[in-house]
């Protein structure tokens, strides 16, 4: 029986794209900061001159799938991380954005074979979003760790 796991080794060669929604940037900027901290602590060059990391900003979470798809199809990246924050309001807009963003991001991973990390917070209040982006913990860190694990795992799977 074979067991396949991400090992967090040889990360010096990994190329990562991060796609960040500008809407609710009070939250998404904190998620990005946590994500970059995790990547840096695991040996990924996160400096402005980095050849390992690119960051793309999009208007909102609805646009995350399209840009993620273009980056994944480029062949330059082993993993794409999406970061967004959709906060429930008084209209059905929340449900539409969350459904389309999540389905679209999942489709990108399936269609391209490139792991795409779903780092979109879906909360009822701004307070809940802020708690998940740094007040209590920073899920951006977790999304960075997931990306590193998936990049490593994909390298050891048969056919890669």
Curated annotation (Swiss-Prot):
InterPro entries linked to this entry: LS, LS/RS, LS/RS_sf
Coiled coil: none
GO process annotations (BP): riboflavin biosynthetic process
GO cellular component: cytosol; riboflavin synthase complex
A Pfam family: DMRL_synthase
Catalytic EC class: transferase
UniProt GO MF annotations: 6,7-dimethyl-8-ribityllumazine synthase activity
Catalytic activity: (2S)-2-hydroxy-3-oxobutyl phosphate + 5-amino-6-(D-ribitylamino)uracil = 6,7-dimethyl-8-(1-D-ribityl)lumazine + phosphate + 2 H2O + H(+)
Gene3D superfamilies referenced in this protein's UniProt entry, alphabetically: Lumazine/riboflavin synthase
List of catalytic residues: 93 (proton donor)
EC number: 2.5.1.78
UniProt keyword terms in alphabetical order: Riboflavin biosynthesis, Transferase
Record-annotated disulphide pairs: none
Positions with a binding annotation for (2S)-2-hydroxy-3-oxobutyl phosphate: 90-91, 132
List of residues binding 5-amino-6-(D-ribitylamino)uracil: 23, 61-63, 85-87, 118
Signal peptide limits: none
Pathway where this protein functions: Cofactor biosynthesis; riboflavin biosynthesis; riboflavin from 2-hydroxy-3-oxobutyl phosphate and 5-amino-6-(D-ribitylamino)uracil: step 1/2
Family: Belongs to the DMRL synthase family.
NCBIfam families: lumazine-synth
Purpose: Catalyzes the formation of 6,7-dimethyl-8-ribityllumazine by condensation of 5-amino-6-(D-ribitylamino)uracil with 3,4-dihydroxy-2-butanone 4-phosphate. This is the penultimate step in the biosynthesis of riboflavin.
Protein's name in the database: 6,7-dimethyl-8-ribityllumazine synthase
UniProt source species: Synechococcus sp. (strain CC9311)
Origin organism lineage: Bacteria, Bacillati, Cyanobacteriota, Cyanophyceae, Synechococcales
Designated gene of the protein: ribH
